[in-house]
């Protein structure tokens, strides 16, 4: 957030307005959490008309689905809020827009966007579900995170440049996802009636109000960046990729087609 240079009274006013908006988003989140507990089934649904994924990705997804039961209940409660948002939008024939947000839009938010779209296709519910990602600032989709999704089985085309617009696909003939770093309010992202999914605690703390969001759900992940340049780099990125994949698949498994 930009610091006010107009004095303490203006700063206080801005803070008050932000707090009120933040309260509204939190209250909306709490209401949806109660509804999620009542309306979302515990048993994940089976894919009805899943897309034929690339072979290596399909094998990877089998292990992802097998891991869903191990997600802690507290975490599932948060994920169900997102599932209910998607379910409600689909039942109303409205687009279900999911925007995944972290500080630099370089690792966790991209993985979340990609895996959410892939999970929706796997369960045959992708129509009307739109996934986006953004940061509080723009950098680039980190090459280490790109390498992790490639190891999972995605096909990725890199056009080059300082902030490449990667083309990511999960199946032949499926729409390619264009992934590049941008701010969460980029013109290409949804600007209203979306769920703001906060994938890092720093962005959740520093940006307490997301304009246009009808729901805000924090599901922070540990930043794999902490392993950059170490012997644990590949293992850490793969672990985070698998965790995010498992939770995105859990979300979509809770949505009835």
Language model segments and positions:
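C-terminal motif of bacterial Sec signal peptides marking the signal peptidase cleavage site
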Residues: 15-17
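Post-signal peptide N-terminal segment of mature Sec-exported envelope proteins
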Residues: 26-49
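Bacterial signal peptide processing site
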Residues: 19-21
């Amino acid at each position: 957030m930009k610091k006010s240079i107009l004095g303490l009274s203006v700063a206080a006013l801005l803070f008050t307005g932000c707090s009120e908006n933040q309260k509204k988003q939190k209250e909306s989140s709490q209401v949806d959490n109660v509804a999620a507990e009542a309306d979302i089934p515990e048993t994940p649904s089976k894919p009805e008309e899943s897309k034929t994924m690339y072979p290596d990705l399909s094998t990877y997804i089998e292990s992802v689905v097998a891991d869903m039961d191990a997600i802690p209940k507290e975490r599932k409660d948060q994920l169900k809020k997102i599932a209910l948002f998607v379910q409600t939008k689909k039942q109303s024939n409205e687009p279900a827009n999911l925007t995944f947000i972290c500080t630099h839009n370089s690792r966790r938010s991209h993985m979340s966007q990609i895996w959410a779209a892939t999970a929706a296709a796997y369960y045959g519910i992708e129509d009307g579900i739109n996934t986006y990602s953004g940061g509080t600032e723009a950098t680039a989709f980190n090459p280490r995170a790109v390498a992790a999704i490639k190891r999972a089985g995605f096909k990725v085309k890199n056009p080059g440049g300082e902030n490449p617009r990667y083309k990511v696909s999960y199946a032949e003939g499926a729409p390619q996802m264009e992934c590049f770093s941008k701010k969460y309010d980029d013109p290409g992202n949804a600007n209203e009636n979306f769920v703001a999914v906060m994938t890092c605690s720093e962005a959740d703390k520093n940006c307490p109000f997301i304009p246009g969001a009808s729901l805000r759900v924090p599901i922070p992940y540990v930043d794999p960046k902490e392993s950059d340049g170490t012997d644990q780099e590949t293992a850490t990125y793969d672990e985070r990729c698998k965790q995010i994949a498992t939770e995105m698949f859990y979300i979509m498994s809770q949505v009835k087609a």
